[in-house]
A protein has these predicted regions:
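Intrinsic disorder/low-complexity flexible regions in very large eukaryotic scaffold/regulatory proteins
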Residues: 205-208
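Short catalytic/metal-binding and nucleic-acid-binding patches
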Residues: 1-203, 215-225, 231-303
């Protein structure tokens, strides 16, 4: 589901068709470079990302094409193509439409990386699987939960002990590079952080992520992803175990739900896209257990 000419946040997931984990450190570095490159061209704010061994996550806010003038298009074109080429006047509307498209953004990212990967590994053929998945995410609580879920991928895979130690993720990029090149947005989703200072915003988000990673099951069995000593060292305050058990294991709600957000947001977006759903019955927002106030378009089974 793509919302045309409206500011919308999407969680994108795309997987390789290759067996195992074909993306090593060098490949992950290259894919991050490509993400940075095209984020400067397209009308987007990158909120989060995570490049894993066989797939990547991207959380982006796509901005409406109507926000950008002809001069904006020409300046972006000139800055991106540094060989001195000029954009033809008749092409300006074409690029305006293209650079506002989530589908075009993801297509260029995947095609550019495929060319690199195939050349680097002396191979031909398809690298990516089915068309990428995209989930519409509401600003606020749904957004920050989705962002934390993305940044905790390396911990769920037992690759690192601290989320910041994984440099191919948004939290790792923020901490290790100090957001080099202003690649990432500091709009983490919760206005109640109550601060404008970027360092304090990042600090608030890191606390939120550590809280999500320090959860316990309601039955008392620990499913902690970060060691208690690490949490104590990183945090100046105690974390309350108030968040759901959604972050410890892969959750389908952050990839297959179609739409997540408040009850009103999900209902409103469903009406907007009602025609594409082949259902005899009216769909209603379903509460996601453990994530208070967050609803899904679909009721999904969880392992």
């Amino acid at each position: 589901m793509i919302v045309p000419d409206q500011e919308t946040v999407y969680h994108v997931i795309s997987r390789s068709v290759l067996d195992g984990y074909p993306f090593g450190d060098e490949e992950k570095d290259e894919l991050v470079k490509i993400l940075i490159k095209f984020s400067k061209l397209y009308f987007t704010e990158v909120l989060g990302f995570c490049v894993m061994g066989n797939h990547f996550h991207l959380l982006v806010r796509m901005l409406p094409e109507s926000d950008f003038s002809d001069d904006d298009i020409k300046k972006r074109y000139k800055k991106f193509y540094t060989d001195g080429r000029q954009i033809a006047e008749k092409k300006v509307p074409v690029y305006r439409c293209k650079w506002a498209s989530l589908s075009e953004l993801v297509r260029e990212i995947k095609q550019t990386f495929s060319r690199y990967f195939n050349k680097h590994h002396n191979r031909r053929g398809t690298l990516w699987g089915e068309r990428f998945k995209s989930l519409i995410v509401e600003d606020g609580q749904a957004l920050i939960n989705c962002l934390a879920y993305i940044d905790l991928n390396p911990l769920r895979a037992n690759i690192v002990k601290c989320p910041e130690h994984y440099r191919w993720s948004s939290i790792g990029y923020h901490v290790q590079t100090r957001n080099k090149g202003n690649f990432l947005s500091f709009k983490f989703g919760l206005k109640d952080f109550g601060v404008r200072n970027r360092k304090e915003r990042l600090r608030g988000y890191r606390h939120y992520v550590y809280e999500a990673a320090a959860l316990k099951r309601s039955r008392g069995k620990s499913c902690r992803m970060i060691d208690e000593k690490i949490i104590a060292k990183q945090s100046e305050t105690d974390f309350k175990n108030t968040r759901a058990y959604k972050f410890r294991y892969r959750s389908r709600y952050f990839s297959d739900a179609g739409i997540i957000g408040s009850k009103a947001f999900v209902a409103r977006k469903y009406k907007q896209f009602k025609d594409i759903f082949q259902s005899k019955h009216e769909k209603k927002p379903k509460p996601i257990k453990g994530l208070e106030g967050i609803y899904s378009l679909k009721r999904l089974s969880e392992s």
